[in-house]
């Protein structure tokens, strides 16, 4: 598929963004091929990315597939734009048992605001690739914002007191969670 590329310097922008991600650094991920509409990310096997049976953890498989798709979408955004995942669905096809994971994300349908991507995650064992997961990822373009950070709230936080079992049941844990989702900051008394 041939895409219009609004930022000819997209590869540098993606490599810079990738280097700032804490999760990818933590799991040892490396950014491979970066092309218009597609990106490849690899993760070597280690105890830190395994689950109890010695396979790659499903969360790691989903995370690198999501990242590969997100960066594939970002290759088609204008300079200064960022991307955020709206949703993704992953189908696990086989246990991730091998030396390395490789995620390949590609744009299926680009859009000005919403882009749909597909991703495949392979495990490499003995030099052979095996498909372990496939996913559908929906990405939102956040135009012109250089830093989209959860540490910089867009709405002011309001404070409420935490439920201490002696307060009325209206502050039970489920209501505290709801209050947090509504932008309240729960504080202990």
Per-region residue spans from a language model:
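HotDog/MaoC-like acyl-thioester-processing domains
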Residues: 2-5, 95-165
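Short, intrinsically disordered C-terminal tails of secreted or membrane-associated proteins
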Residues: 180, 184-188
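Hydrophobic beta-strand-centered segment that forms part of the acyl-chain substrate-binding groove
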Residues: 71-102, 107
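Non-catalytic linker/capping segments at the edges of enzyme domains
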Residues: 1-42, 150-165, 170-174, 189
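Residues at secondary-structure transition points
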Residues: 18, 22, 26-29, 51-63, ...
């Amino acid at each position: 598929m041939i895409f219009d590329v609004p930022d000819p310097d997209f590869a540098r922008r993606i490599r810079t963004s990738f280097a700032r991600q804490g999760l990818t650094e933590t799991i040892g991920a490396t950014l491979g091929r970066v092309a218009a509409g597609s990106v490849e990310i690899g993760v070597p096997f280690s105890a830190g990315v395994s689950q109890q049976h010695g396979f790659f953890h499903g969360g790691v498989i989903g995370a690198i597939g999501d990242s590969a798709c997100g960066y594939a979408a970002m290759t088609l955004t204008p300079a200064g734009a960022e991307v955020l995942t709206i949703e993704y669905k992953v189908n696990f096809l086989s246990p991730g048992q091998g030396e390395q994971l490789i995620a390949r994300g590609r744009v299926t349908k680009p859009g000005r605001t919403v882009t749909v991507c597909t991703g495949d995650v392979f495990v490499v064992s003995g030099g052979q690739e095996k498909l372990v997961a496939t996913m559908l990822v929906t990405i939102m373009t956040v135009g012109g914002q250089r830093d989209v950070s959860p540490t910089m709230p867009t709405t002011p936080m309001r404070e409420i007191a935490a439920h201490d079992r002696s307060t009325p049941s209206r502050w039970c844990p489920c209501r505290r969670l709801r209050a947090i989702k509504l932008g309240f900051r729960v504080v202990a008394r």
